[in-house]
């Protein structure tokens, strides 16, 4: 009886002291984001269409598809649940996650942005010269400010979540490389979850939007995993992106280089997509319908990482004790 009790107490103590519950809380966080996002999506859709009808300056909101409201709802849910996640993990400051203040943050953001955006535009120029992409008839110059705002918001939010909170927490449990690979894979999986772009059949299957429409759309976000070319060209590129961002974060003990890189990739992707269009439907495996998919983007991201780590300034801030 005494041995059994001692074993039970020891097991409980070991369980409480281990970091395994951290991983479970992170998994629960992502499940909760999917559930809350699906619940919020119809309300965002109704609110957006109402605002579009009530305010002429916001009329464009009535033309936004339910899929885009669904994506934004997931983003809202991720932000809303981030604070409870941090509290449950007993994270009080960035130093608890191995991050330190970076006095050279402007330099790191600027270099990361210029390198990522510059090489992505270089890839775009090659695709234009090769005839795989062409300039749009009506250039969407008005999309450029939106691309800049989106790049800033997405990079700060996602780097705070993935390379800040998640990578810092997983490193408590696993070694450096297992943690980096796990978070990079998670980053790629999350970005691979999106509804199909072919809206007509999808909207027909959904019918009129009701408060459970988000849950009806939720199973359809996994469609890209059934396409082997998309899985190879898209998922692998996203994985290398996530791995690069994670490695530079731990090398500098700061998020700013990763934020600059991420913002450069988002701005380059959205700008090129606004100004050009593919000349044919099937370009895989070399390139897809945007600069995120294909072996060409994969090589470009890998080259960006190699240049960054080779030439980056070595005077980086050190973590606090």
PLM features: residue spans?
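N-terminal, membrane-interfacial amphipathic/helix-forming hydrophobic leader that caps
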Residues: 1-94, 98-101, 105, 117, ...
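Alpha-helix N-cap/helix-start motif at helix boundaries, enriched for small hydrophobics
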Residues: 97, 159, 258-259
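Gly/Ser/Thr-rich helix-start
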Residues: 99, 113, 156, 165, ...
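Residue-level signature of the transmembrane alpha-helical core
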Residues: 109, 113, 117, 148, ...
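Hydrophobic alpha-helical segments and helix pairs
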Residues: 129-161, 165-166
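The feature captures the transmembrane alpha-helix scaffold of multi-pass secondary transporters
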Residues: 144, 148-149, 177, 181, ...
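Membrane-interface helix/loop boundary segments of multi-pass membrane proteins
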Residues: 157-210, 250-254
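Catalytic-adjacent loop/helix segments of enzymes that bind and process anionic phosphate/sulfate esters
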Residues: 217
């Amino acid at each position: 009886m005494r041995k059994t009790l001692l074993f039970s107490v020891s097991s409980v103590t070991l369980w409480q002291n281990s970091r395994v519950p951290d991983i479970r809380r992170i998994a629960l966080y992502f499940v909760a984001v999917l559930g809350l996002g699906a619940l919020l999506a119809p309300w965002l859709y109704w609110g957006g269409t109402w605002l579009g009808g009530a305010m002429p300056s916001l009329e464009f909101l009535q033309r936004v598809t339910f899929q885009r409201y669904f994506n934004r709802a997931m983003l809202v849910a991720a932000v809303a649940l981030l604070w409870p996640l941090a509290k449950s993990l007993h994270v009080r400051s960035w130093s608890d996650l191995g991050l330190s203040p970076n006095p050279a943050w402007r330099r790191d953001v600027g270099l990361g942005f210029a390198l990522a955006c510059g090489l992505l535009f270089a890839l775009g120029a090659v695709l234009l010269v090769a005839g795989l992409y062409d300039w749009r008839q009506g250039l969407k110059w008005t999309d450029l400010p939106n691309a800049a705002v989106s790049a800033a918001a997405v990079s700060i939010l996602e780097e705070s979540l993935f390379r800040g909170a998640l990578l810092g927490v997983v490193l408590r449990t696993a070694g450096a490389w297992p943690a980096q690979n796990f978070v990079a894979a998670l980053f790629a999986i999350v970005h691979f979850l999106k509804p199909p772009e072919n809206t007509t059949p999808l909207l027909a299957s959904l019918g009129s939007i009701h408060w459970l429409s988000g849950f009806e759309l939720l199973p359809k976000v996994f469609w890209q995993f059934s396409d082997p070319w998309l899985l190879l060209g898209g998922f692998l590129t996203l994985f290398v992106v996530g791995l690069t961002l994670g490695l530079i974060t731990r090398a500098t003990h700061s998020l700013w280089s990763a934020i600059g890189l991420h913002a450069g990739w988002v701005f380059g992707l959205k700008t090129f997509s606004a100004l050009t269009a593919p000349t044919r439907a099937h370009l895989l495996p070399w390139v897809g319908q945007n600069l995120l998919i294909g072996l060409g983007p994969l090589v470009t991201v890998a080259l960006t990482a190699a240049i960054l780590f080779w030439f980056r300034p070595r005077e980086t801030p050190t973590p606090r004790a």
